Amino acid sequence: RFKARPTIDIDLLGERISNDKGNLKVVFEKICSIECEDDGVFFDASSLELEPIAIDKKYPGTCVKIEAHLDTIVQQVSVDIGFGDVVTPYPLPLDYPLLLSDVPAVELYAYSLETLIAEKFHAMVDRDESNSRMKDFFDVYQLFTNHEIDRTLLAEAIVCTFKNRNTPYREHLALFSDAFATDK
């Protein structure tokens, strides 16, 4: 079973929805107005903040921040929404574990592990020597160590991701060198 590293945000792929800031705010206000007394969590729609992310990319994204309340606990939740990414072969249903057994299950769809690896590999190649995001290397290592990865599907996902992001494959990258691997 995959033991995930801690993360501070939720990453979503926006499909069949505009990345217009005003539209996203309305959508999140509607989501926040849905009451679920079973879990006791309240999302404060008046605290909504939306900021552009990945503005240098083909399809800029949006970071949505909102306060969540559980009794006296207040926590800011950050949701990064990307647009225009490809998922190979397609988004897959995710069996997401719940902390409370009496709360209704959530229906989620997620990237295939092969697409997840392809995107992390793309980040490694795109940043090459300037990559300070060791989390991508750790994540790829963990995914290969703890899961069976379909190598054919992975190759397809890498090709699709690089093509979609207009990134040519380059040989002799510094990140594949011994010097990069042993650099402290």
Identify the residue ranges that each predicted region occupies.
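Compositionally biased terminal segments of proteins
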Residues: 2-184
